[in-house]
Amino acid sequence: MKKIIILGGGGFIGGHLGKRLMDDGCHVRIADIKNHEFWDHSEICHEFIKCDLTDPKSVELVISENCDELYQLAADMGGAGYIFTGENDANVMHNSALINLNVAKECFVKKVKKVFYSSSACMYPEHNQLDPDNPNCIESSAYPANPDSEYGWEKLFSERLFLAFNRNYKLNTRIARFHNIFGPQGTWDG
């Protein structure tokens, strides 16, 4: 049985991912600072650890040495109503960067077999996203960097962090840039 850890599993994407992986027969551990708003823990994971991933000791506790796959979805995100006002930029950048610094280091230390980092299309330059019918969101358009928000800058930084751990320490990392994810069990406020 695959051993999976989902960081940020109390959120929209993490809850759906946990449910799917449990249905596929995986053992799922979720860590988040909050409970899932819509699902009971037993519906999305075998183990739920409520903790603050900005704390390195919490990350050390959550990430086990026998982890087959780790999905890093955790961020100080709080929903679109939180990240795009500009009022929370310092917290978004500081807290999310701390989470990712802690996670990358601990994944290397514990020799996690595969790491998935959830980035965002917000890391693309703002001018690439102005035409909603034809966003220029391809790899060659990512630089020169000019993300549309501090959230986007932090996502870009953390992409570079995980890629550096992949390059320097052989941390098997995959990255996806999500764009406007919504659906059942989603929330505007996070």
Protein language model features and the residues they cover:
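Glycine-rich NAD(P)-binding loop of the Rossmann-fold in SDR/ketoreductase-type enzymes
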Residues: 69, 91-102, 110, 149, ...
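Active-site Tyr-X1-5-Lys
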Residues: 126, 146-174
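Rossmann-fold NAD(P)-dependent oxidoreductase module
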Residues: 16, 20, 106, 161
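NAD(P)H-binding glycine-rich loop region in Rossmannoid oxidoreductase-like domains
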Residues: 53-95, 106
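Flexible, glycine-rich beta-alpha linker
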Residues: 123-125, 149-150, 171-190
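N-terminal Rossmann/SDR dinucleotide-binding element
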Residues: 1-69
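Conserved Rossmann-fold NAD(P)-dependent oxidoreductase catalytic core, especially the SDR/UDP-sugar
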Residues: 101-148
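SDR active-site strand-loop-helix element
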Residues: 7, 31, 70-76, 115-121, ...
